[in-house]
A protein has these predicted regions:
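Second-shell loop/turn segments in exported
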Residues: 6, 25-29, 101-109, 148-156
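Extracytoplasmic segments of membrane-associated envelope/inner-membrane machinery
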Residues: 62-138, 143-144, 150
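Terminal hydrophobic membrane-targeting helix
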Residues: 1-93
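Extracytoplasmic/secreted envelope proteins and their assembly/folding machinery
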Residues: 16, 20-23, 36, 40, ...
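Extracytoplasmic/luminal low-complexity segments enriched in Pro/Gly and acidic/polar residues
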Residues: 156-198
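Flexible glycine-/small-residue-rich
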Residues: 9-11, 56, 66-70, 104, ...
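Short secondary-structure junctions
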Residues: 44-50, 122-129, 173-178
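Extracytoplasmic
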Residues: 2, 14, 47, 57-61, ...
Length: 198
């Protein structure tokens, strides 16, 4: 029988009680006959567990390697959003300092997170970091990048408008970027730039 279980991983958010429940079930199972996929599934069903690897060590030891999900941001300032686009209750003890703010209608967190990933992939390669992404009730998109510069994409043709922003950025037409308050791309053939303190 299994008499020893080792747990490995940097566990900040995973419920120890949830793990202990599975560990108690695992103990005294037959070493050769234990259903690893069953226990892997039970462990991966625990909040914040991204993946689990189970290794057997002869003659009676099981090693559990748990990988914790990352916190990506705050959803509507009241829930945590993980790297899989799932929401969790806000626990102040496990909240990193600089979280991206996600705003949107209830039930649309996956859409907002997917759009964030799309925009972030393009922006981060240009040295631009997203602070906030918002989808309002009308379906209008606004991205806020550091240092607190709003990029207003509106409701329609958002991909085209975002590409227009990237083109302008790539052509170095946005001088003194940090002095900009917002860039409004909701126009069919151009954009408006408002400078800070203007």
């Amino acid at each position: 029988p299994i008499t020893s279980i080792n747990i490995e991983g940097d566990l900040k958010r995973i419920s120890k009680k949830g793990i202990e429940t599975v560990v108690l079930e695992l103990k005294n199972q037959g070493f050769l006959t234990v259903n690893q996929s069953k226990y892997k599934g039970k462990l991966e069903a625990i909040d914040w567990v991204k993946s689990v690897k189970i290794n057997k060590q002869w003659p009676n030891t099981i090693n559990l390697i748990l990988i914790e999900d990352d916190v990506i941001g705050l959803w509507n300032e009241r829930l945590l959003l993980n790297s899989s686009g799932e929401l969790y209750a806000l626990d102040q003890r496990v909240v990193p300092d600089e979280l991206i703010q996600f705003f949107g209608p209830e039930g649309r967190e996956n859409e907002v997170y997917t759009r964030y990933k799309l925009y972030n992939d393009e922006l981060v390669t240009r040295g631009i970091l997203i602070e906030e992404i918002e989808l309002d009730l009308r379906g209008s998109w606004v991205i806020t990048v550091r240092p607190s510069i709003k990029i207003k994409l509106g409701e329609e043709n958002t991909e085209e408008r975002f590409e227009r922003f990237l083109t302008v950025w790539d052509q170095s037409l946005l001088e003194n970027f940090e002095l900009i308050s917002y860039i409004d791309l909701r126009y069919s053939e151009g954009f408006v730039i408002k400078r800070k303190n203007q």
